[in-house]
Design a protein with these regions (language model features):
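Tandem repeat scaffolds
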Residues: 1-145
Length: 145
């Protein structure tokens, strides 16, 4: 990947890179761009992904347990079989994201996440728990009926 300076800080750009099975657990990846990259079965557990971009990325089977995903761009990302348990997705953008077979969302905070109505309904069908960091109830954050 390449890197660039934006606003005085370095941002790594991994556009179109194959990052299957990589381990990013606990890393500070704030603002990193993973757009259009293949990042299947990667480990982002407890990573700081605030404002990162996964636009059109293949994240199938990746683990985001207890990750800070505030303001993350997941537009058109493939989250099939991803593990989001305990993640904080506050204000993330996920219009067009593929959530087929996304089942591991317990204790996830979805507050103010921009998503389609059908995505919200699918997530409400399996939502449970309370986010350990924010204390927000998963179903309430999804505005489930």
């Amino acid at each position: 990947g390449a890197s660039t300076l934006q606003g005085g800080r370095r941002i790594t750009i991994t556009r179109g890179v194959n990052l299957d099975n990589t381990n990013w657990a606990g890393e500070n990846l704030k603002g990193v761009a993973f757009q259009q990259s293949v990042v299947r079965s990667a480990n982002f557990e407890k990573a700081n992904l605030r404002t990162a971009s996964f636009f059109d990325a293949d994240l199938a089977g990746s683990k985001f347990n207890d990750a800070n995903m505030k303001l993350v761009n997941l537009e058109m990302a493939d989250l099939s079989n991803a593990d989001l348990r305990g993640a904080d997705l506050t204000q993330a953008y996920m219009a067009g994201a593929v959530i087929k077979d996304l089942k591991l969302i317990a204790d996830t905070d979805w507050t103010d996440v921009d998503m389609r109505k059908d995505q919200r309904s699918a997530l409400c069908a399996i939502a449970a728990g309370k986010n350990p960091r924010t204390g927000v109830d998963t179903r309430e954050s999804l505005m489930c009926p």
